[in-house]
Amino acid sequence: MKRLSKILLVFLMVLGLTACSGGSKENEPAKIEMGKENKFDDLVSYKIETISRPQQITPDVIGSFYTYYKPSKSTNVLIDVTMYMTNLQKKEMKLSSTLKGTFVIDKTDYVASTAMVSEDGKTISQGGSLAAEGTNKVHFYAEVKPSLLKNNIEFKLTTVDEENPKEANMSFKLTDIAKNYESKNLNDKIVLDGRGEIALQAVNITKKLEPANPVGLYTYYQVQNDGNSFVVLTTSIKNISESDITASNIAVAKLVDKDSNEYPANSFYEKDDRSNLASASTTVLTPGQSGMIHFVFEVSDAVANGEKSVRITYNGKVFIVNL
C-alpha cells in the first residue's frame, strides 16, 4: 500500500505540473501573418497590406493640398506597416488608447505613431478612432536610421490593457517583403474582385503630361523642378461593381525605386476622345464604364531612369508592376 501511495502521489504531481505549463501558453504572443486576417478577439481584426520605407506617410488620394508625415531628421527614414483594421466592438474605438505598435531593431524599441486614412482616401490624421464595427486603413510607422533597415525587424502590436495585455508579433527583413506580393508586367490585367479591372498599358518618362489630341483650351501638367521627370503608368480601368466609383478610389499606386524609397501618385483621367485631362478624384466611373487613368509620379531624373517598379494596392491585395 505504501508503494501504491507513492506512485499515485508522483502521478498527481506530474499532472499538476502539466496543467500549469499548458496554462502559460495562453499568454504567449500570437504570430501576425501577412495576407491573412489576424485578430484580437472581441476587439479588432486586421490584415497587413504592406510593409515599406516611405519618404512620407500620405493619404491614398493625392490632391492639390494634403497633410503628410515625414521624418523629423532629413537623414532618417520611416518604417511603415499598413493594415486594414476593423473594430469588432459596437462602440467607437480610439486607437491610441486601445493598441500600441512597436518596432524592435537590434534590441532597441521604436514606438510607432499611428495615422488613419479617411474612407474616401483623401485625408490622413494621426491617431484617430474607428467607428463601431467600422474599417479603415491604418499606418503604424516609426523614424529610424536607414542603416537599421538592413537588419531583422520585429513588429509588435499590443493591446493597452494593464490587467490582461495581449500581444501579436512578426519578424521580417524588409528586402523579403516583396515576396508576399503578386508580380505583374505591362499588358497584364489586375482584377480586383467585385470592384475593378486594371489593364496595364504603358510607361512613359516625360517632363510634361498632356492629352493625346488636345483641342482648344486644355489642361496639362509640367514638372515642378527641372531636375525632375514624370514617370507615367497609363492604364485602362473598368468599374465591375454595381455602383458608381470615383476613379481615384479604384486602387492606390506608389512608385518604388531601387533603394525601396516610395513616391505617391497623382492620378488623372484622360477623356475618351483624348482631348483633355481631369483629376481622377473628380471623375466617376459608372458600373461597366472604362476610362484611361494615368498614375503620375514626379521623381528625380536619376530615379526616373533607374531601376523601379509600381506597387498597386487595394483592401489588402498587393501587386508589383515590373517596369
Cite the ranges covered by each PLM segment.
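Conserved functional micro-motifs across diverse proteins
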Residues: 20-80, 84-323
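Sec-dependent N-terminal signal peptides of Gram-positive bacterial secreted proteins and lipoproteins
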Residues: 1-25
